[in-house]
Amino acid sequence: MMRINARTVPFLATLGVFILLYALCAVQYPAMLSSRVIANLLTDNAFLGVLAVGMTFVILSGGIDLSVGAVMGFTTVALAVMIEGAGLHPLASFTIMLVAGALFGCGIGAAIHWLKAPPFIVTLTAMFLARGAALLLSTDSIPVRHDFYQTVSGLSLTLPGGGRLGLIALLMLLAFVAGGVLLHFTRVGLKIYALGGNARFAGLMGIDTARTTILVYGVSSTMAALAGIIFSLYTRSGYALTGVGVELDAIAAVVIGGTLLSGGVGGMAGSLIGVLIQGLILTWITFDGSLSSWWTKIAIGMLLFIFIGLQRLILQFSAPTGRTG
């Protein structure tokens, strides 16, 4: 008889919840099974998915990153200023922001490691810095009218049934695949899991915890910058207040996806499903038409509470027990 590893239970529960919700929604609204709706579900949640990729790295390492929403907002407004104000080509602007995001994240990781400061405090500080910098650039929404944006918006992969999977959705899926490969098939991934499992023991095992911590937050901020690029392409504008509170949505997606808040357990597949659950609930409410979109937050809060409780039970039952006698 095959035994199920207790640490895979959160992921299996997440998968079961998604399948059940999708089935119930499809029974009520058969159009949910169309490739158009599926493509829209992926496209509309592409920026959140990319944020969840970076957040998965951070939470797996035992940390937290509250700055990703602000970095995303700063990226959108900085892109608009560079493209519309300075006349830079979008590709050059994208490159600048990805590098800036990586450097910003590495600075966060370095501060956390060398100052021995809690990730919550350091990333909260980084959130204020990034949001303040965005507001210094502009307090208004800046439209981006470059022809490149128009061209990119027309790029898509046609699915059976007529659905069109946009470039930004493909970028999100590529980010999840790349993140999964890095976590599960490289030594870097092993170091991240070890750091999240027990940072002290990871250091005793010879793992460079400083480099790993810096890498993790560098990846997170790079993904936040990429999310800003995706959102800029999606809305064709830049706004300093973009992404307010979205870091909490990313954390919720990762935790609902089965990654333990304490670190060391989880994966990319679960985070993707966590993102899709959030998108599915919002789509269901939109189809219904009689409910406020704020019900999405209530539903996600309830799911988050349930999954955190499930995590506590798993940690309790999987913890080694002492023997007497």
Predicted segments, located by residue:
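Single transmembrane alpha-helix segments in multi-pass membrane proteins
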Residues: 21-30, 35-86, 110-116, 254-268, ...
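Transmembrane helix-bundle core of multi-pass membrane transporters
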Residues: 5, 119-188, 212-215, 235-243, ...
